[in-house]
Amino acid sequence: MPSIVSLTAALTFVGAVIASPVEKRSAFSVEQVPHTTYLKNGPAQKVKTLRKYGKPVPQSLLDAAESRDAVGETFTASAVGDGSDPAVPSDQYDSSYLSPVTVGSTTVELDFDTGSADLWVFSSLQASSQLSGHQYYQADASKLKSGYSWKISYGDGSGASGKVYADKVVVGGVTATSQAVEAATSVSAQFSRDSNTDGLLGLAFSSINTVSPEPQKTFFDTVKPQLAEPLFAVNLKYHAAGTYDFGYIDKSKYTGPITYVNVDDSQGFWGISATAYGVGGTTTQRAISGILDTGTTLVYTDTAIVKAYYAKVSGAKLDNIQGGYVFPCSATLPNFSITVGGVAQVVPGKHINYSPVDSSGTTCFGGIQTNDGLGMSIFGDIFLKSKYVVHEAAPDSPPRIGLAQSASV
């Protein structure tokens, strides 16, 4: 017969399991998965970024995106852009990075996106015509959050929407047993055509989650109380799969010190401030406000900064037909940096060559473009691929970003 002590301990254990949405305290790493099925389309990336942040898209940019000589990627004006868990480039030029996630009983490949706060997936609720080439969540009616819905919409009326479920989500070594899963009932053409990506896992702040009538917690916020440390770190790489580290900092992945700064989370993003920028060996003092966003491919910043950069690139020009700054692919590109927390965060020049704009590989599209229409700077994968970036959100202190030079650079 069990003792009162052992029975009490057992009941306490059961109560803890019921009360907690995750199974155990943990620290883990998730590796990305690469795809090499299409060439990058620089103008289309700009279109997707503008739409992601709810900004109007100039017709000239749409025209440039449509006329891009891409292999395996057709862009139309109606399209919508957008652990250590491994992150894999979704094309041969590192256009995006995907990571395996088990949602319910299905493993899908999701875009880990620090610029949004929704965990949404393709699902069995969609028409079969939208599911071709995708892995998708098998919706379980018993786990439906009745009365809840979600919708991501863009200026042209396109987007994605659906129902909300409370289900198991496994990322790397941790399981959230009651995570809000936004199951799509309908998605627009660009999402359904992109068979590389089965949805998004948002890692911005839960305040901008789109679920109605009540925003839901991100995966990070759900598992954070159970992590060894209340943080995740991003280690994207140049022409290679990167990782997401949850609950710990991997000292083997960076060199030098980590520079920490407080985050401006007033808009729900991982916002930072810089005091200067550098082009080659020249540093210019200038206040820059921006966000770090793994769901955006390029860097978008103030026009004066972009002009100053390409002024140092032989043959560079603003090409409206291509939708941005281009240069001879053979050009030597200077390093670029922003000063954050008193430390210059350097992006190697070779990272700023985004992709060719023609089949001959003569002219290339720049990885740094103007932020016209965005109202802020966005430091996407072009910036992040040379960094180890710590995202810390302790319950008793302001959120912080930590930046260090990646050991893989």
Curated annotation (Swiss-Prot):
Gene3D superfamilies: Acid Proteases (2.40.70.10). The active site is at residues 113, 293. It holds the Pfam family Asp. InterPro entries: Aspartic_peptidase_A1, Aspartic_peptidase_AS, Aspergillopepsin-like_cat_dom, PEPTIDASE_A1, Peptidase_aspartic_dom_sf. It is an enzyme of class 3 (hydrolase). Disulfide bonds join 329-364. One of its GO terms (biological process) is proteolysis. Glycans are attached at residue 335. One of its GO terms (molecular function) is aspartic-type endopeptidase activity. CDD domains: Aspergillopepsin_like. Residues 97-404 form the Peptidase A1 domain. Residues 20-65 form a propeptide. Keywords: Aspartyl protease, Disulfide bond, Glycoprotein, Hydrolase, Protease, Secreted, Signal, Zymogen. Its EC number is 3.4.23.-. Residues 1-19 form the signal peptide. Coiled coil: none annotated. GO terms for cellular component: extracellular region. Secreted aspartic endopeptidase that allows assimilation of proteinaceous substrates. The scissile peptide bond is attacked by a nucleophilic water molecule activated by two aspartic residues in the active site. Shows a broad primary substrate specificity. Favors hydrophobic residues at the P1 and P1' positions. Monomer. This is Aspartic protease pepA. It comes from Leptosphaeria maculans (strain JN3 / isolate v23.1.3 / race Av1-4-5-6-7-8). The lineage of its organism: Eukaryota, Fungi, Dikarya, Ascomycota, Pezizomycotina.
